[in-house]
Amino acid sequence: NEAYNEKYLGLLVYIGRSKRKAFSYLKDRIWNHMQGWNERTLSRQGKEILVKGVAQAVPTFAMSVFYLTKTFCEELSSMIARYWCSQQDNENKIHWVGWQKLTRSKGRGGLGFRDIHDFNIAMLARQVWRLVQEPKSLCAQLMKAKYYPNSSVLEVEETANMSYAWRSICHGIELVKQGVILRVGKGESIR
């Protein structure tokens, strides 16, 4: 059981069936930060800086490697939204503006908070893009040998033996495909 709690670079080495349990440490870290902030009286601008600079930054490294479920991301967003709207520790206030509107850019009438799920997909798409752009890197060669030896990273199909990290990266493939245009070069990879 101890092996299941091993961490490397702050990330779990083994992700079991329960993703909520595996990533609960992210919620705990954000919650602990926000509890410390509640003791201070902060202006809206102060809260905005703390939310953007700390609460939304804490899960960034994990999100660049693992897919966080939409439900889990909604729980994180809900926790942040409750903090944003509350005045004191146990005091709930009315949300006058929906969280979706707050995640819009400032130019579009929002506050520029991140949509955590969309940001997670974008971070995973970034990993896919690295595999596409740097096929000679050690990581790309390792992934190609294990998961797509006879095709491109953009043509990967899900199989039963995929690790959770690779399955997570596959969530970013569709986003990359939306922005990629096939360019015919020498014609060697065209079927």
Question: Model-found features: residue ranges?
Answer:
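A helix-boundary/hinge signal
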Residues: 1-191
